[in-house]
């Protein structure tokens, strides 16, 4: 049976919103519930088509130049909203509009300059974003070829355009959709989330010209409102340590296969936002081992793995790891290959000596947890 992938990917997972709903005041529950219900419907529906949104996914027009279009939903939920800033227009004066415009360019430039990729689809796809979606909507998501940003409530989350890596993360879901199109459940779904975290973080580092040891490796560093106990939504450096707050709860991400969360499919699509901490940590390990700018070696290994025809849509952590080792060797040398093997081994995923030359992904093997 052909599995049709869910092309809607949200930044804030249901379990965070459930914690906020449980712990917030009665007066705040309605807004939280609206975001929670919407997020869950986006994750669980395999196909969502609405007549009031732009379908930017089948645009075959080839362009060599950046084209951004920013829309304002005016706190409604009809998409795309009103066009308020198109390519080449001056600053709008609305911080959300201008942040989206600026960081869409930063993401485009990252993929163009580092990977010679022409927008998300490598064909010059227009970048479309809608801001001010919903009333105090507490999420951002990628769907049907566009970005959507909520304003947050100002008490838990700030406006979702404040973090460049959030925009880089969600647009990277578009790149994944146009390449490996990893199925958004279980380990392949966790890799989908992790790869978006990886490239979102690299967009920030590239924009700030940070080396691996200078970066925070935090996703959504500017998102948490004043008074919330945390540094962001996820930490690639220390999975599970991003936040510990009375409203948000404690970050449940593991950083090692020993702590892998075996969730059912109805719980975060099998833990896609949770178990992504394991490959996140593996990438961080490699970036630190190699030093310098993380996009130059570690990033290129991950990107070439994403493009590999042997990467199955239902891949596992181990299968993905094998391919990263293959590309580390093919792109660089034995030292980088060994660093890649060691980085996965440190999170409990062991690429065996007899496996490392295969480079093929059958999508069936299970991650080995013994080190």
UniProtKB/Swiss-Prot annotation:
It is found in: Secreted. One of its GO terms (molecular function) is metal ion binding. Optimum temperature is 50 degrees Celsius. Active from 10 to 80 degrees Celsius. Its cofactor is Zn(2+). Its main location: secreted. Residues 352-371 are annotated as: Disordered. This is Protease PrtS. The gene is prtS.
